């Protein structure tokens, strides 16, 4: 059983997906699986993923019958995961090559953590890179996390699910709080915010890390703007 599953919900990202997959297959920690979710785009994204899958058995491709949107595409990917922990990677972003190694290092120290939030790097279209420096190495109970992060740090977009490691069973359990009608609705914004709070409520311990492991890349098709991510 792999330790970590990296989920890539994929829709019309042929310009970027090779970079994202390369950042997964070249992780310094090798005991992972990479799940590419085909959300029925019209470009060659999945063809590119299939070429990588031919060369690396850790890559699994699953196909949605129709376009479900980000929330459901991620959910379908997690249902197919075989690991104890999952991480989301939007295919127009990419990971530091030691991202999974850092996850495992923290898990070995904070064995009861259900959720780990890492700082990340914002890469602008111009090439300018801003490194986040708003998190410290800390572990919280759910009550401490709500008080110290959600209430006191209102300038931080804490509800984005990128740059986070989540225990698989907690993510799946969080969907039991959603009405079936919501789950079957194709949302076009705030998908992360919808499920984030249910995830947090299911956690026992939450860890934050000052390590930058995730490159959030600005592009013309980015679904979230700079100010929605974090004030850097």
Regions found by a protein language model. Name each.
Residues 1-25:
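N-proximal low-complexity "stem/linker" segments adjacent to membrane-targeting elements
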Residues 2-4, 25-36, 44, 56-60:
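Short loop->beta transition adjacent to catalytic acidic/histidine clusters or analogous donor-positioning motifs
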Residues 18, 43-52, 94, 98:
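Acidic helix N-cap motif at the loop->helix transition within catalytic regions
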Residues 38-47, 66:
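A conserved acidic beta->alpha catalytic loop
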Residues 64-81:
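Glycine-rich, basic loop-to-helix element that forms the pyrophosphate-binding segment
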Residues 86:
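Short aromatic/hydrophobic "clamp" motif used to bind/position activated sugar donors
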Residues 144-229:
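Conserved nucleotide-sugar donor-binding catalytic segment
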């Amino acid at each position: 059983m792999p330790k970590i599953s990296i989920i890539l919900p994929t829709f019309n990202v042929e310009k970027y997906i090779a970079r994202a997959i390369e950042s997964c297959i070249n992780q310094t920690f090798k005991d992972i699986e990479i799940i590419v979710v085909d959300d029925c785009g019209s470009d060659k994204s999945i063809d590119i993923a299939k070429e990588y899958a031919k060369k690396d058995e850790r890559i699994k491709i699953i196909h949605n019958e129709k376009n479900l949107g980000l929330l459901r595409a991620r959910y379908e990917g997690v249902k197919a995961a075989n690991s104890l922990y999952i991480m989301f990677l939007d295919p127009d972003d990419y990971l530091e090559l030691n991202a999974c190694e850092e996850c495992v290092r923290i898990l070995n120290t904070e064995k009861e953590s259900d959720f780990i939030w890492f700082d990340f790097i914002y890469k602008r279209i111009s090439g300018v890179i801003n490194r986040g420096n708003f998190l410290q190495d800390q572990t919280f109970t759910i009550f401490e996390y709500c008080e110290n992060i959600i209430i006191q740090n209102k300038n931080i977009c804490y509800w984005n699910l990128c740059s986070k490691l989540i225990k698989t069973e907690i993510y799946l359990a969080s969907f039991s709080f959603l009405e079936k009608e919501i789950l079957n609705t194709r949302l076009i914004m705030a998908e992360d915010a919808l499920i984030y709070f249910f995830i947090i409520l299911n956690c026992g311990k939450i860890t934050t890390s000052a390590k930058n492991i995730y490159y959030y890349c600005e592009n013309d098709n980015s679904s979230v703007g700079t100010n929605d991510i974090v004030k850097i």
